[in-house]
């Protein structure tokens, strides 16, 4: 798959797939095409070449990079979760519980901390019981312990729902350790594999240095499950 925006090539010859129950992290420098790849996966961006193939009826949950709310507009968490269509209190509580914040339903959105706000965005993405959960810089603005706690919750969500997870992040040492597979992107896939494999790859070290590997051990993810059936596949049909 290749993507061009305003005549400029953003992604070129990307071939990747996501399997059921798998946690995949996309890392790369600013401008490397990470968010563009996620937008292509949800259908918001069309490839200039190649295709994005989705499993029939695939349910996708999406947590955006940023969401600005008018501070002067009163809005409870329940009301926010019910946009654009209302949901029951039971559904809201269930989604918030899975996201790890069961007591926020009546709180004002503008009164939430950064970590709470991100958990509510996660709850909103979980309302449709997704088979594929996409997170674009979901911990932006959180401190390191907050980011680590968020990614631990994502692992729990994967266990509870059995969904595949694709994350874009700059929290390299935290998010890579929480992953089954890492894609290092810089306009194309530079390298991919297990977190340790990618951390040792010369292409990765050329972009990020060698400091990631030691800190990854603090948040090591346990690979105790298997992955079956591709949910999503991006393919470049050009030669």
Where are these regions (language model features)?
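ABC ATPase nucleotide-binding domains
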Residues: 200, 208-239
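Helix-to-loop junction immediately C-terminal to a conserved catalytic motif
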Residues: 42
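Catalytic Walker B motif of ABC-type/P-loop ATPase nucleotide-binding domains
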Residues: 133-136
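Conserved ABC ATPase signature
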Residues: 108-112, 116
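H-loop (His-switch) and adjacent beta-strand-loop-beta switch element
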Residues: 182-194
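Conserved ABC ATPase "signature" region
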Residues: 89-104
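H-loop/switch region of ABC-family ATPase nucleotide-binding domains
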Residues: 169-170
